[in-house]
């Protein structure tokens, strides 16, 4: 099974993230590299270079760009996704994360748990949208989708 062995975020020109966003980014990147599934299907009947892959994520011209190379720097794929389908779920995710970060500081565990469940639900929705948008471009499992969605949110935060 193919996977991502290295990931970078092109956040040049974006404002610095908050400490909470930076922590989310670090955790998502670590977890992603520990365990992920990322398979590129053949394109137009031609095979694609096999992984593991180095993936760079960027937002360019209001599009999410996946730049995928092999470990030997051979171009494997590049695809651009419209950010439109992600806008509402990213906005909802940031709002619930803000509530969660505030709750952790001052609310009892039962209320934190309720907010966390809502946060996970929105995160799952964003992951599902990502899997749909990548259909035919890359096959990823739900855990990989969740971690990549977190990184997309980090890029959105600055953009």
Curated annotation (Swiss-Prot):
Superkingdom to which the source organism belongs: Bacteria
Signal peptide positions are none
The membrane spanning regions, by residue number, are none
An example of a Pfam family matching this protein is UPF0262
Tell me the InterPro entries matching this sequence.
UCP032146 (IPR008321)
**What family does this chain come from, according to its entry?**
Belongs to the UPF0262 family.
Protein known as? UPF0262 protein RD1_1069
Origin organism of this chain? Roseobacter denitrificans (strain ATCC 33942 / OCh 114)
């Amino acid at each position: 099974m193919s996977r991502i062995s290295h990931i970078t975020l092109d956040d040049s020109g974006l404002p610095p993230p908050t400490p909470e966003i930076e922590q989310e980014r670090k955790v998502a990147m670590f977890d992603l590299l520990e365990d992920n599934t990322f398979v590129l299907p053949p394109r137009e009947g031609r095979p694609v270079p096999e992984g593991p892959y180095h993936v760079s994520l960027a937002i360019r011209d209001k599009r999410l760009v996946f730049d995928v190379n092999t470990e030997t720097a051979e171009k494997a794929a590049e695809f651009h996704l419209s950010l439109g389908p992600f806008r509402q779920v990213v906005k909802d995710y940031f709002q619930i994360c803000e509530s969660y970060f505030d709750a952790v500081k001052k609310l009892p565990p039962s209320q934190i748990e309720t907010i966390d469940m809502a946060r996970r639900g929105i995160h799952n929705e964003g992951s599902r949208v990502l899997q749909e948008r990548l259909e035919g471009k890359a096959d990823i499992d739900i855990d990989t989708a969740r971690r990549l969605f977190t990184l997309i949110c980090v890029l959105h935060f600055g953009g």
